[in-house]
Regions:
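Short, acidic, metal-binding catalytic loop of nucleotide-sugar glycosyltransferases
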Residues: 25-35
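Short aromatic/hydrophobic "clamp" motif used to bind/position activated sugar donors
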Residues: 90
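N-proximal low-complexity "stem/linker" segments adjacent to membrane-targeting elements
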Residues: 1-27
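Acidic donor-binding/catalytic loop of UDP-sugar-dependent glycosyltransferases
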Residues: 48, 97-109
Length: 216
């Protein structure tokens, strides 16, 4: 990858059904903005998943970088991806979610003079679970899942991601956003170009507890 790559897309994967991972990868590859690298961090998947990921990475070697390490969790995997990225901007996609084809170009248009943006999502709930969760800061208030802060809703300049590492544990994404707000120009935007599939088995994000989702 050349140093002038515009966007680094990071994806941490751990034993998610490869059909979902393939959907996520394909949604990145078909972006209408093509100056990106996709860094897949394999967080210790099974042999079957590892082989599938390697085959895909080899097929698209001009776009995909594959990194593997023993199971460390999503936060540490994303941190490693940040260290290996060369893009001017960084964003994240979960292995069972997907982008609309204009996601990267929309984020680039929106960020303008900001240093980090957090976008709304288009949430697809795969069970009969509710679309609403309690606000961590006000438990009497319900917020829509589309409004919550997730790894994949963050898009920003590399210096923001290099300044703060993600902390392991629940709500690492929201915690990162709150810390970034103290030092950088941050804005929430209404894009809905990130498709969040909720309640997919074995997703790294599937264990996020509702009480840790917050609205900022």
């Amino acid at each position: 990858m050349l140093n002038q790559t515009k966007v680094s897309v990071l994806m941490a994967v751990y034993n998610t059904d490869f059909s979902y991972v393939k959907r996520a990868i394909d949604s990145v590859l078909i972006q209408d903005f093509q100056d990106f690298e996709l860094i897949i961090i394999d967080d210790g998947s099974t042999v079957t998943n590892r082989e599938s990921l390697l085959q895909y990475a080899e097929k698209y070697e001009n776009k995909i970088i594959y990194i593997r390490h023993s199971n460390r969790g999503q936060a540490e995997s994303i941190n490693r991806g940040i260290l290996n990225s060369v893009g001017e901007f960084i964003t994240i996609i979960d292995g069972d979610d997907e982008y609309k084809s204009n996601h990267l170009s929309s984020c680039l248009r929106e960020i303008k003079e900001e240093e980090l943006i957090c976008s709304t999502t288009e949430t697809i709930v795969d069970t009969n679970d509710d679309f609403f969760v309690p606000d961590k800061n006000d438990l009497t208030k319900l917020i829509h899942l589309d409004e919550t802060i997730l790894f994949g809703t963050l898009f920003g300049r590399k210096k923001v991601f290099s300044s703060f590492s993600f902390k392991s544990g629940f709500a690492a994404d929201a915690d990162f956003y709150e810390r970034a707000k103290t030092q950088f120009r941050v804005k929430k935007v209404d894009l809905r170009t990130y498709i969040y599939h909720r309640n997919i088995p074995n997703s790294i994000c599937s264990t996020i507890k509702k009480e840790n989702l917050i609205n900022s």
